[in-house]
Amino acid sequence: MAKRLIMMMLRNILYLPYAFINLLRYAKNDKISEEKKYKLIRLIGNRGCKCGNVNVHGYGLENLPKESGYIMYPNHQGLFDVMGFVHLNPTPFSVVIKKEAYNVFMLRQIIQTMGGLFMDREDPREGLKVINEVANQVKSGRNFLIFPEGTRSKNGNRLGEFKSGSFKAATKAKCPIVPMAIIDCYLPFDTNSIRKVDVQIHVLPPIPYEEYQGMKTAEIADIVKERIEKVIAENEHNFEN
């Protein structure tokens, strides 16, 4: 992680103060529009990808619902996951992330500017509050990204257990579920290298509420995981990294 992150920072040495100052300004300022905040986040994401020698290949973006108020559920490979999707996606979204990220320089301000929420995975009561908050915001038209594994997989493109509780936000909001398959996004920060890498983000067809209505969240988790695994198996050898 160190080499590529250092390269990103060195190549953005003149831009970093501007970005950080604006993140501090935007993070908790409700008077600044969501679109303006997200424009800053995308600029940071775009510069990070370009200066970090990371090619992000996006597929299926047309599958994102035209109407806001949905939740995206990707597999989780590391810190680059969100940056990669920000780089691809022109539509603002928020993210639920583990509370440990709150202490990471700039990451806290980025998540706050996105309207994201920090979750304590060890506190079920707080977790339920976050799930309810996500559901309420999605009902109001905000889009969210939730990692159903809860933590990143440490086995490359192999998936960990999908926590059924993460899908309670969707069942409460009665919103479309958008599965996403992330491939090789662990490479930018998990390998001690600055060579060019190609990562893939596949947006799968959404699952409308009518399709999963009445299902248990464990069943929904299994369906989403199965669809993501299928796409990864079909595409993980598309590039030579």
Residue locations for each model-derived region?
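Catalytic core of membrane glycerolipid acyltransferases/transacylases, capturing the structured
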Residues: A19-R25, K37, C51-G52, K66-P124
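Hydrophobic alpha-helical segments typical of transmembrane helices
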Residues: I44, D81-G84, I97, M106, ...
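Non-catalytic C-terminal accessory region of glycerolipid acyltransferases
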Residues: A2, L128-N241
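Short, basic, glycine/proline-bearing loop/turn elements
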Residues: G45, G116-D120, T151-R152
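Generic preference for hydrophobic
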Residues: G58, M72, V95-V96, G116, ...
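Membrane-anchoring hydrophobic helices of lipid-metabolizing enzymes
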Residues: M1-Y70
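Short gly/ser/thr-rich secondary-structure transition/capping motifs
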Residues: C51-Y59, E126-L128, I183-C185
